[in-house]
A protein has these predicted regions:
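N-terminal secretory targeting modules
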Residues: 3-4, 9, 18, 23, ...
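Conserved SGNH/GDSL esterase-like catalytic core that processes O-acyl groups on lipids
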Residues: 71-74, 137-141, 179, 185-276, ...
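Proline-centered flexible-loop/turn and helix-kink motifs
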Residues: 92, 297-298, 329
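Surface-exposed acidic, glycine-flexible loop patches that form ligand/cofactor-binding
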Residues: 156-159, 248-257, 290-296, 373-376
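Glycoside hydrolase catalytic-domain groove-lining segments
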Residues: 276-301
């Protein structure tokens, strides 16, 4: 096929235009990426099994390259060098406090399986990182896949402090439900729940203790809040020995032996009708406390009750502890009925649950009781 001179030069001109368009498009694209911050930057990935990561609480390490969890208040600690740190999480249901160098840096609200920036543009030096789970167990487990740092940066050894250990077992008062709510009639959601400011963690920090929280809103000993039946199938004794609430893997109790166990259960059993029978309630409560004692042979156990609507259940619980002490001779278990005067206008968040001010008052009332009993 013959090409005329005119067609030949037209083709050359067309080719030149295409090259220019491609060059301009490439330049614009690269510029856009640079200014948007999406341009590729070399990063160092740190696996979750790195020895410089400290885990506090119940975590599932059974899967390679993934650490799973869901209980409220679990903590991940590390030190890192550099200006930037991100976390790989598969999670769309939870919120986390991100502390950098001991100060609250941000609240992370997860939405999907992705890489979340925790901090950037920091001073180029060593930093401490503490992540605390604000929210209680949701629909599924969280999968932690590690950290990303700038290329050349790394995690640094964590100096593990020799702290006391406390385990808190209970309900929404330990999860911090509604603790950041503005009024008692506000509706609970994940954004106003902050386990970190609930009285258990506040108390633990006062006592220089690490803590583990096994708590579920609405949970009971024999009957959960809102159940139309006299008994519920999935109460705290059902979930207690799990590594994660939403998985059946059993927890290895030898991994973490607390000095003190604080149990606050029973309010939900008697929050609304139909009430469980006294025999069923006390029998199951004694059975559960015996399980705790078997798992933690050396720990002290504080069984706590503070009146919410009615305090009759507190008498039932006191009788449980007295019967157990008489039967077994256990001198390291005791009962406390805690009366704290909370101001209805200042000390309550959502759904008649304490806010930060209310939780601080409860922790302040408990601190001298525990210090005296534990000789702390």
């Amino acid at each position: 096929m013959l090409i005329t001179k005119r067609k030949f030069f037209s083709l050359l001109k067309f080719r030149s235009i295409i090259k220019k368009c491609f060059f301009i498009s490439s330049f614009v694209l690269v510029g856009a990426l640079l200014f948007s911050g999406e341009f590729y930057k070399p990063e160092t990935h740190v696996r979750p099994d790195n020895p410089n990561i400290e885990y506090i609480g119940r975590f599932d390490f059974s899967r390679r390259g993934i650490v799973r969890f869901d209980w409220p208040g679990v903590q991940i600690k590390t030190h890192f060098s550099g200006t930037y740190c991100a976390i790989k999480l598969k999670d769309g249901y939870n919120n986390y406090n991100i502390f950098i160098d001991g100060k609250l840096h941000k609240v992370l609200r997860t939405t999907s399986d992705t890489l979340y920036t925790l901090a950037e543009n920091l001073n180029d030096r060593e930093h401490t990182l503490l992540i605390t789970k604000r929210t209680e167990a949701r629909k599924d487990l969280v999968s932690f896949r590690g950290f990303n740092l700038n290329a050349g940066d790394s995690l640094l050894p964590v100096i593990k402090e020799k702290k006391r250990k406390i385990e808190f077992i209970g309900d929404s008062f330990f999860t911090g439900l509604g603790s950041e709510g503005k009024t008692p009639d506000c509706v609970f959601n994940r954004d106003n729940e902050n386990c970190y400011i609930a009285f258990g963690p506040v108390l633990a920090r006062k006592l220089n203790a690490d803590y583990s929280i096994i708590a579920i809103s609405g949970i009971g000993v024999v009957r959960n809040d809102g159940d139309p039946n006299l008994t519920s199938k999935r109460t705290m004794p059902y979930f207690y020995e799990r590594t994660c609430m939403n998985d059946t893997l059993k927890w290895d109790f030898q991994k973490w032996q607390p000095d003190l166990v604080v149990v606050r259960l029973g309010n939900n059993d008697y929050w609304g009708k139909p009430y469980p029978t006294l025999h069923a309630f006390q029998t199951e409560y004694i059975k559960f406390l015996k399980r705790i004692r078997k798992l933690y042979s050396k720990a002290s156990i504080l069984v706590l009750c503070e009146p919410v609507k009615k305090d009759q259940h507190c008498n039932y619980i006191s009788d449980v502890v007295n019967e157990l002490k008489t039967e077994s001779g256990d001198k390291k278990i005791w009962f406390e009925k805690l009366n704290v005067n909370l101001d209805k206008t200042k000390d309550f968040g959502c759904q008649e649950h304490p806010n930060e001010s209310g939780h601080k008052k409860i922790a302040a009332a408990l601190e001298p009781i525990i210090r005296k009993a534990m000789n702390w």
